[in-house]
């Protein structure tokens, strides 16, 4: 009778292995994994534990996505995102807040395209086609949903409009110029040398030679009305102009993260290679300032292909 060779495996840290590794006995993962694992949890120590059962907690309205909210070691919550709706549960599955719909701008089709980042009591949720959403914990039983807004500089204000601290980019062709009818004031006509504007630009900011203006009226693809927040150098045609990197016209970021005490956005719909970061400790202030180490960052990641 043939002897049976038995080998004891005690480490499954590599989890379930790709079938392409079936013959890779030279790979360390081969001896620390399994061909198939069903209804098991991997332990940090390398062992396995049977998956526990589940219990009914709530009925969600159609397709949903669950994301964690960990405020502290002893306070955690569960966000259930569904079509234009947010439900909040505690870690035991009890409902904390239900049917929050205000500013929940995601659709069922977008649920698993959303990205999010948490810092303390705040979660940011992004999608390239939607304004950035901010969820804030007021208490263990109270959460609010609002749209993200860049910080404003109220030391620079004209006609009740403040200077913004958001990032800018010139989407228009490099040869296109804009010509202001005056160097300061409100209700000033701005004329572009080629089709540049759409109605959605109304209410957005521009920079002209580094000076901020805000569009307050749309006339045509080549003409808008502006409020000049910082005095312009001249009324000559100027090629050095830029518009908001992030807007309803150009789309919104697809990626968000906190790193080095900054809030980062990337993958904007119309400029997917753009990566921008807030000032250190000022998560709503993306002003580049004079380029000091603690000020905002606005760069493009270049490569052979354009990726998000």
Residue ranges and their predicted role:
Residues 1-96, 134, 138-187, 228, ...:
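N-terminal beta-propeller domains
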Residues 81, 104-133, 263:
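Elongated alpha-helical scaffolds
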Residues 187-192, 220-231:
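A generic structural motif
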